[in-house]
């Protein structure tokens, strides 16, 4: 099995469907004997440039360990799911389990308040 980092952006008007979408992808990964090392919901964030006349998107980050055929299933679903604006799947050398810098920054801001 290989390690992957996946980031996908969801249409901001569909933020209420995020938990269902995450459960769907968790099920695909678990049904294919995969392991989820990290799952982060970054929430709604400003886009660097507009995509389909949108200025914001809901970001989800996953670090998983799966067989390549599972990545093919996920890529196909990302491609044909019209609420997903963009996605990026990167192969990584090892599992990343610590918090991402974006989530660390959010936690630091909450602690200061």
Curated annotation (Swiss-Prot):
HAMAP family: Ribosomal_bS6. GO terms for biological process: translation. The gene is rpsF. InterPro entries: Ribosomal_bS6, Ribosomal_bS6_CS, Ribosomal_bS6_sf, Ribosomal_S6_plastid/chlpt, Transl_elong_EF1B/ribsomal_bS6. SUPFAM superfamilies: Ribosomal protein S6. CDD domains: bS6 (cd00473). The keyword Ribosomal protein applies. GO terms for cellular component: cytosolic small ribosomal subunit. Pfam families: Ribosomal_S6. It comes from the Bacteria. GO terms for molecular function: small ribosomal subunit rRNA binding; structural constituent of ribosome. This is Small ribosomal subunit protein bS6. Binds together with bS18 to 16S ribosomal RNA. Keywords: Ribonucleoprotein, Ribosomal protein, RNA-binding, rRNA-binding. Belongs to the bacterial ribosomal protein bS6 family.
């Amino acid at each position: 099995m290989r390690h992957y980092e996946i980031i996908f952006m969801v249409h901001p008007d569909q933020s209420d469907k995020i938990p269902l979408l995450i459960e769907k992808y968790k099920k695909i990964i678990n049904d294919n004997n995969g392991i989820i090392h990290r799952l982060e919901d970054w929430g709604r964030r400003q886009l660097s440039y507009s995509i389909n006349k949108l200025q914001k998107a809901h970001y989800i980050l996953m670090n998983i360990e799966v067989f390549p055929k599972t990545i093919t299933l996920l890529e196909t679903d990302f491609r044909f799911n019209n609420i997903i604006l963009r996605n990026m799947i990167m192969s990584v050398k090892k599992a990343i389990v610590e918090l991402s810098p974006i989530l660390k920054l959010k936690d630091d801001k909450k602690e200061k308040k």
